[in-house]
């Protein structure tokens, strides 16, 4: 296994099965963040992650963290909180504010560079990247964003500036996504936060099998139209 240098003249990627074991999932470097290349990456189970000053790095880890939306773990305390929630949750109302929130709310630094922000703005404008916003009155207090692949949603990042705000974003999205035919959420790499919410590791090969099937599914035509998700009308 060796790290592949991508060409700027082709959006082709090597097979994810050729990714390095250490660091886990590193597959390629270089290329660019054009919409066509990003979409090709997601279609193949690959995503970009790199620090400021580094070349663009492309990853497909094994195992892969996923969340089945019906299996979101709703703790008793979160259930009580949500029943009296002070929040309003919307879809695709403030993509730019959400990705900037994810970029800025990282004490240890961020991988969401200005080039990443620009690239995902382009994907959003093309109808492929989407945001979930959590509002307290008129203030954005949390949210998440990611890339749609049919009935699979590739979660990229989330942030929280108030109690349970990011949990609320994921909970409400899971409920709405599942209700409309969504099947799986890609969480990329398992961490304590996503594990506490029900995410689990599966073999990369299984993830790629799910992706190949689910990306061909179609959600209702107006699913990604900007709207209020919570509270219901």
Curated annotation (Swiss-Prot):
Cited Gene3D superfamilies: Leucyl/phenylalanyl-tRNA-protein transferase, C-terminal domain, Leucyl/phenylalanyl-tRNA-protein transferase, N-terminal domain
Q: What is a single cellular component term in the Gene Ontology annotation?
A: cytoplasm
Coiled-coil intervals, chain numbering: none
- Reactions that this protein is recorded to catalyse: N-terminal L-lysyl-[protein] + L-leucyl-tRNA(Leu) = N-terminal L-leucyl-L-lysyl-[protein] + tRNA(Leu) + H(+); N-terminal L-arginyl-[protein] + L-leucyl-tRNA(Leu) = N-terminal L-leucyl-L-arginyl-[protein] + tRNA(Leu) + H(+); L-phenylalanyl-tRNA(Phe) + an N-terminal L-alpha-aminoacyl-[protein] = an N-terminal L-phenylalanyl-L-alpha-aminoacyl-[protein] + tRNA(Phe)
Taken from the record, one Pfam family name reads Leu_Phe_trans
UniProt entry keywords in alphabetical sequence = Acyltransferase, Cytoplasm, Transferase
Which EC number(s) does the record attach to this protein?
2.3.2.6
Report the superkingdom from the record: Bacteria
Q: Which InterPro entries match?
A: Acyl_CoA_acyltransferase, Leu/Phe-tRNA_Trfase, Leu/Phe-tRNA_Trfase_C, Leu/Phe-tRNA_Trfase_N
Tell me where in or outside the cell this protein is found: Cytoplasm
Q: Which GO terms describe its biological process?
A: protein catabolic process
Note the SUPFAM superfamilies from the entry.
Acyl-CoA N-acyltransferases (Nat)
Q: Which family does it belong to?
A: Belongs to the L/F-transferase family.
Question: PANTHER family, per this entry?
Answer: LEUCYL/PHENYLALANYL-TRNA--PROTEIN TRANSFERASE, LEUCYL_PHENYLALANYL-TRNA--PROTEIN TRANSFERASE
Q: What does this protein do?
A: Functions in the N-end rule pathway of protein degradation where it conjugates Leu, Phe and, less efficiently, Met from aminoacyl-tRNAs to the N-termini of proteins containing an N-terminal arginine or lysine.
Q: What is this protein called?
A: Leucyl/phenylalanyl-tRNA--protein transferase
Q: Which organism is it from?
A: Klebsiella pneumoniae subsp. pneumoniae (strain ATCC 700721 / MGH 78578)
- Name of the gene this protein is made from: aat
